[in-house]
Amino acid sequence: MSDLAREITPVNIEEELKSSYLDYAMSVIVGRALPDVRDGLKPVHRRVLYAMNVLGNDWNKAYKKSARVVGDVIGKYHPHGDSAVYDTIVRMAQPFSLRYMLVDGQGNFGSIDGDSAAAMRYTEIRLAKIAHELMADLEKETVDFVDNYDGTEKIPDVMPTKIPNLLVNGSSGIAVGMATNIPPHNLTEVINGCLAYIDNEDISIEGLMEHIPGPDFPTAAIINGRRGIEEAYRTGRGKVYIRARAEVEADAKTGRETIIVHEIPYQVNKARLIEKIAELVKDKRVEGISALRDESDKDGMRIVIEVKRDAVGEVVLNNLYSQTQLQVSFGINMVALHHGQPKIMNLKDIISAFVRHRREVVTRRTIFELRKARDRAHILEALAIALANIDPIIELIRRAPTPAEAKAALISRPWDLGNVAAMLERAGDDAARPEWLEPEFGVRDGQYYLTEQQAQAILDLRLQKLTGLEHEKLLDEYKELLEQIAELLHILGSADRLMEVIREEMELIRDQFGDERRTEITANSADINIEDLISQEDVVVTLSHQGYVKYQPLTDYEAQRRGGKGKSAARIKEEDFIDRLLVANTHDTILCFSSRGRLYWMKVYQLPEASRGARGRPIVNLLPLEANERITAILPVREYEEGVNVFMATASGTVKKTALTEFSRPRSAGIIAVNLNDGDELIGVDLTSGSDEVMLFSAAGKVVRFKEDAVRAMGRTATGVRGIKLAGDDKVVSLIIPRGEGAILTVTQNGYGKRTAADEYPTKSRATQGVISIKVTERNGSVVGAVQVDDCDQIMMITDAGTLVRTRVSEISVVGRNTQGVILIRTAEDENVVGLQRVAEPVDDEELDAIDGSVAEGDEDIAPEAESDDDVADDADE
């Protein structure tokens, strides 16, 4: 007992568990659950097929008992339970499990209803014809062989398959910490994809999908939607929805409808499916079914679902799709062993690995065949030498007391070449000379020296080979060998020829075993890009002060003459008014900047479309805004271009410039666009090119204009720098990035405004007080905003009462900076203008002329006022 105790070594249980479990996990991953990307087989499948091949259980020979094969597999290669091996054989023989069966079974191998196969002592099997293509050239040293579990047998590490079996038959398995689930595909399509890859190794996933549109299941059915396929082929993971093929038939006399199911999804148990439908009918979870029966037979599947007279067959069928396995999801997870390591692979990765495997197999096969051809040519040379020297050789053999001495005598002396010289000359450059042949053998000094192998071949020569006809056959065979050797050397020396051989073999496989696609792939509404269904049109987007947002077509608003009463743009709640207004395209992205400096994304078409009088929807229901957070600026963006900046201005006069690409990745929770100080908020956002100028307009009628490059580009979370020096309670109301020669239109809260040429605003330094933009008087009120306009533009103005006026810019006077302007919109008492927006596409003049409108009396002739001393002083201050 003490001796035993001395053999016990204490170990840390954590380390032992970690080490042992890791060993177990890797054993399961590599040796059991995952297929090799090259041949698409797990170890148990590979061992079964190899055992059948060794047994000579070929497709064109008699069947053998399954028990015989199972015994060989578990006895030689797979030391596990017989049931696991037999289950593997059964699955490879089921037409509803494998797209291309690898085992040809005779007997009861189960059914799609879940019936078990008969015992292995009753069933018989042999290799399917296509299975031989997985093991073709196995005897030509094309793959490495490894020891079996006890070292008494050898088994191939991988099959030299000519078929891309991983994609063709798929695979599924659960390992430790990972799993694989690869759907089967159509052989013709997969090989076409491989050929396309051979032609262009830079082919894209989309290019491969032109040849391989999606999985092809043995049970056919319908794949509903392409998006999951595209995702799986691109990333290695995805989900597809498989729907049963069913049709609704109506009785011509009674009008009653019947649902006929001809195909069900892959891996669905038909009997359980029917039981589930019956259960749903019994529990009244599905209404409208009067009878259910299975009429499937040897000619095909047929599930009959009779619909009640008052029910609609399509409605019943849709309910069955949603509540039963008439529609299922298939999660694609393309994990396979690549160089012995588990790896998730996309479609191109799998095809690339298979083509590389074929390149290695064909190369090794060519080397093997070249060696064998040279060895045979070496023997033929000896036989030709024997025929050329027949008399002395026969005399030598007759005199030799033993075969060993005869062999030694043949090797010890040179022999005349005779007519063999021409034959050897045809070979040229020692192309047929074996690599192992020493220099002293073969042709030397005009004579031929035999090797031991050649001497033995001469001794084994039958007398009938001495006839003239046999001599001609020998020469013809040698000539054919020389041609074969030349071709083999060409394959080894030319990558193009090597790939051509691979292509030819794939085409032969396709032509021999290829068939039509079974599974139909249909478009799903989820696959259709919603933008493709939405027409592009210009719309008016409005955001009220209390956060109601909507859009409506721009054509809903008719142009009115200056001073018109306008039309209501929105029915607003009491004490609410339109706070933001812009014109955008339905396909644009709206960048929504909040009062807290955060940015949210929305497509214009995602906004609620509402009529002119409707309020819209609260934007808090569309965006994940926090408490007391509101949207203060919105900006339409078509594309996120390099070199374009987002320029932001706050009410306190702070400005910030950030690259537009910083905002190109939408996040559902939003991101920080600018850090704001307490009490500050965004008032304007625009896009700049890096060489633009910036204009900031304040409520007190001041404006500062400076170069954009005076503000460096900053990150998203930066606060910014001062753009304008404000006095007292003044605040910035508008940001303009002037472009072209358009004028600046300034509007005040009492409905007055004016146009002033942009070049009248001098360029100053950043962070100064600026110059006067418009006279702020009791009549005008403070400045509401400013926009840049052209003569052909129209503008839209909106009041806090919800009144909107659309006016042609050409009707507004162009005056100097230091003026009060003219009336643009008549407002009621206690009604103020709160926003304006330029409209770049005016309607026809005929429409404008047809609209009634009034012009404010005397306003049109208001002349520019002389600058006061205070104004001059303000300008001189800069």
From Swiss-Prot:
The entry's localization annotation reads:
Cytoplasm
**Which Gene3D superfamilies would you find in this protein's record?**
3.30.1360.40, DNA gyrase/topoisomerase IV, subunit A, C-terminal, Topoisomerase II, domain 5, Topoisomerase, domain 3
Principal cellular location given in the protein's record: cytoplasm
Ranges for region Disordered: 844-878
Enzyme Commission number, as recorded: 5.6.2.2
List the InterPro entries: GyrA (IPR005743), GyrA/parC_rep (IPR006691), Gyrase/topoIV_suA_C (IPR035516), Topo_IIA-like_dom_sf (IPR013760), Topo_IIA_A/C_ab (IPR013758), Topo_IIA_A_a_sf (IPR013757), Topo_IIA_dom_A (IPR002205), Type_II_DNA_Topoisomerases (IPR050220)
What positions does the record give for the motif labelled GyrA-box?
560-566
Gene Ontology molecular function: any one: DNA negative supercoiling activity
Q: Supply the SMART domains for this chain.
A: TOP4c
Catalytic reaction list? ATP-dependent breakage, passage and rejoining of double-stranded DNA
The UniProt entry's GO biological process terms, in alphabetical order, are: DNA topological change; DNA-templated DNA replication
PROSITE patterns in the cross-refs: TOPO_IIA
Further information in the entry reads:
Few gyrases are as efficient as E.coli at forming negative supercoils. Not all organisms have 2 type II topoisomerases; in organisms with a single type II topoisomerase this enzyme also has to decatenate newly replicated chromosomes.
Q: Which NCBIfam families match?
A: gyrA (TIGR01063), PRK05560.1 (NF004043), PRK05561.1 (NF004044)
Give the UniProt family note.
Answer: Belongs to the type II topoisomerase GyrA/ParC subunit family.
Q: In UniProt terms, what function does this protein have?
A: A type II topoisomerase that negatively supercoils closed circular double-stranded (ds) DNA in an ATP-dependent manner to modulate DNA topology and maintain chromosomes in an underwound state, and also catalyzes the interconversion of other topological isomers of double-stranded DNA rings, including catenanes and knotted rings. Replenishes negative supercoiling downstream of highly transcribed genes to help control overall chromosomal supercoiling density.
Know the name of this protein? DNA gyrase subunit A
Source species: Salmonella typhimurium (strain LT2 / SGSC1412 / ATCC 700720)
